[in-house]
């Protein structure tokens, strides 16, 4: 057994697990059933409950997102588990800019609904889009977790990210999230980045969010933990791995073996939560989940598309597949398989992305590059 190292906490990204697997997430009646089992697992300091595309889906179900958020956060709050949401900085929960007074009000409302932390990101890492939200969240009594959207390009170096972190921390952010939404951040770079931030700002909490799609995530988790990260975002079966996130069981086992202080997992509760999540998938959500999202692919290293977009993109590709082949048949040209289309799409992204200045491929810029 290695020497005891620092404590590492875990956050279950229950919202992102769904968004990265398909188009939708459970109804509120299902969310309130799963929450006590997540609590019972006993290994999560935090749970991602809302934000991102989550609340738009409530509206599609005819649910009131305000009531849904209150209902889902309540069991975690009672158990002393922090809840966190995802917000798009200047764009709040939308795809386009939201007036400042509305954003200011949003944090007050979300805090009243039981959300503790807001993870504020800008797809361009533009601090001017993040800093006002840090101030509004602090005013509302929330913890603003300022985000670095991680990608791999000639521009995105340790120095680049560290200087952004300095500005966000100076603006009042007590926490920094490394949002490796496509899982293409190189483990060595991520470790150096965590060390650089921690050396300068030892009291700032660092949370790592890395998708498992291209296969680097376990090495990245190891590197960030060895260099001072505090919290790791994880998933659980039946929706871990693939384009989603590593499973809590594997991450906990790896870190425990290395001497990190990690919580134990109540496996009875894990299996119950796993079965219940599968039940949600079987009832109707599985219709909107592409089976290929369970696969990891090193091809993703080339295109850098985020886990959260692979679900909707595969559904979109399937939707246009037959139409494209119909046109090709009309021209007496050979038909294309889904794999052919995917490779063409990856090539196109590789061509378009540098021309746009290497924007991190996350909402809304992933959509621009994809479309």
What are these regions (language model features)?
Residues 1-119, 123-371:
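Catalytic cores and adjacent flexible loops of soluble metabolic enzymes
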């Amino acid at each position: 057994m290695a020497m005891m190292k620092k404590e590492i906490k875990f956050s279950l990204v229950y919202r992102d697990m769904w968004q990265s697997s398909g188009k939708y997430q459970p109804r509120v009646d299902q969310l309130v059933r799963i929450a006590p089992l997540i609590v019972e697992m006993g290994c999560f300091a935090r749970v991602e409950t809302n934000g991102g595309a989550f609340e738009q889906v409530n509206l599609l179900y005819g649910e009131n997102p305000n009531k849904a958020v209150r209902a889902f956060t309540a069991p975690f709050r009672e158990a002393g588990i922090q809840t966190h949401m995802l917000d798009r900085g200047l764009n709040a929960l939308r795809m386009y800019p939201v007036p400042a007074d509305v954003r200011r009000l949003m944090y007050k409302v979300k805090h009243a609904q039981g959300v503790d932390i807001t993870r504020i990101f800008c797809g361009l890492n533009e601090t001017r889009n993040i800093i006002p939200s840090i101030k509004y969240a602090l005013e509302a009594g929330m913890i603003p977790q300022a985000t670095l959207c991680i990608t791999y390009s000639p521009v995105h170096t340790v120095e680049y990210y560290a200087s952004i972190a300095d500005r966000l921390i100076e603006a009042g952010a007590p926490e920094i999230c490394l949002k490796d939404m496509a899982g293409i951040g190189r483990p060595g770079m991520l470790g150096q980045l965590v060390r650089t931030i921690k050396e300068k700002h030892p009291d700032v909490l660092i949370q790592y969010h890395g998708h498992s799609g291209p296969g680097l995530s376990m090495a990245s988790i190891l590197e960030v933990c060895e260099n001072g990260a505090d919290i790791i975002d994880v998933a659980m079966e039946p929706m871990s791995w693939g384009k989603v996130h590593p499973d809590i069981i594997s991450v906990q086992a790896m870190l425990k073996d290395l001497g990190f202080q990690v919580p134990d997992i109540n496996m009875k509760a894990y299996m119950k939560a796993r079965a219940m999540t599968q039940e949600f998938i079987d009832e109707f959500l599985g219709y909107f989940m592409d089976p290929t999202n369970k696969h990891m692919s090193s091809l993703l290293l080339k295109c850098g598309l985020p886990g959260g977009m692979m679900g909707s993109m595969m559904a979109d590709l399937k939707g246009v597949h037959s139409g494209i082949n119909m046109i090709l048949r009309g021209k007496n040209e050979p038909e294309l398989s889904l794999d052919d289309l995917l490779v063409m799409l990856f090539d196109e992204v590789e061509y378009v992305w540098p021309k746009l200045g290497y924007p991190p491929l996350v909402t809304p810029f992933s959509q621009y590059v994809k479309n």
